[in-house]
Amino acid sequence: MIVRMQHLDLVCVASDREATLEKLRALGAVHLDLAAAGGAAVTAAKGELDDAEKAVRLIRKARGKDFADEVRPCSVADVLALDDDRATLVAEKERLEREIKTYEPYGDFDPVLAKKLLDRGIDLADELPAKLPAMRLGKMREKLARVVNRIAVDDAKTARADEQAILAKYPALRDKMAFEQAKELMSEQGAVAVVSGWIPVSRVSGLTSSARDCGWGLLLRDPAEGETPPTLIEPPKFVRPVKVLFEGLGIAPAYDEADVSVPFMCYFSLFFAMLVGDGGYGAIILALTLFGWRKHLRASSKAQGKGQVVVVRSWLVLMTVFSLATIAWGALSNTWFGAGLPWCADWPTVKWLGDPSYKNMMFLCFTIGVSHLMFARIWNGISAINDRRCLGQFAWAGILFFMYWITNTIVGIFTGGIPVWLYVVFGVSFVTVFLQSKGIEKGMLFLNVMSTLGDVISYVRLFAVGLASVKVAENFNNMALSIFSCTDLIWVKPLLAVGMILVLLIGHGLNFAMAGLSILVHAVRLNTLEFSNHKGISWAGYAFRPFKTAKE
């Protein structure tokens, strides 16, 4: 569900504003619009955080992949100073390289001696450049070598800087910036200071108790028309990890919209499995996830913020669910790294999904699609059951079912034509929607009805992308086998085996990466566009982020 919010105005004595903010932060229940805060103190605090992040990037860049030296304490300022020195040296290096390239054709001559000869009137126009260098070529090369060596020394010092010590300062720096932002939001009006924000209804009692103890004044009210409270989603426990997926995608339903966490999680898992389409890939994802679980369980006992632990654990739960769903799909379709297991070939699901005409797979995709979209419309209807508008939502479900039948008829899955009763369902549904439409909605009704056909057909992407993934894997398997079997010479076989393994690794690696990309494109789209359009989810909200310390 989406938690109800109340708007609050908190009043305190102006001289106690910092202490008030400290207690408000300790409470960890109030959302403040920190992004709207500015000012010199905020800029300075943000600059400190940016400097720390830049220092970490510089250290990682200097280390590369094979760093194994002992780290040494080094402040952020020291790392940035090394970078500034390096930038100056790089500019000097580039200048010297340009000069060497310019004067190299003239050889290693002494510019002082050349000037003396020119001053005596000796014509050396063909042998000397128009402008004499400041030093001879050999000296330039020596200086360039010294500059290159100093750059290497700076890089080595940067690489040995203690990255973890800087990372450990991140929470405190973030807290400092958030606190300065909160101070800027807290306006002073004479002897009092006022700050406004949002608080979940369930946390109001804790705030009022603190207000009594601290002598604050509180004004609490429900959101006014036109206000946009933050969205705090509290889904059922078994799908709670989906919240990190929403955060990762940067989406949140608006405050007055529905919480679609349960259908999003269920259908996204199904889409993930069908788009990857290979149980072998699912096994790899599961193995990587189990490795992640092992590292997480070891690391969670160390000094780490509770919020960070929850985020990592939620992602691991999600990947466990997605990988198991993919393995299950691989078992149902008998697809393992683009090949099938002989002893599974006669399973009913394998035969049904493996129909050479692909009609069964398309039928499954269209059925999943119409169930997804009809679920959205029926949910809307049930939510508005005490309002006559619910009839319009149920009517849209009828239109979707009619389009589903048409889609299956177009591709030859249903061969008996469209039954008369379905025309009646469509007619009644269309008239119901028409009568409930107003203004421009009536003018757009025909296009909206036709777009439902496109929405249902859109789910065929689950079949098309999944099939493409399987075919790519099959082709790389065949390519690898053809390389290994191209000759019967025994002494060549080891080399051919290496080539076969390389082809398999590269081919399946690329296919695995493309499967990940297809999830970001297609699985996300079907949930956030097709389904959300029918459910009425705009994803125009912003997440509830309470003012609290970064370690919480």
Indicate where each model-derived feature is located.
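Long, charged N-terminal accessory/stalk domains
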Residues: 1-264, 292, 313-319
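Conserved, carboxylate-rich catalytic/transport cores that coordinate ions
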Residues: 1-6, 18-32, 202-552
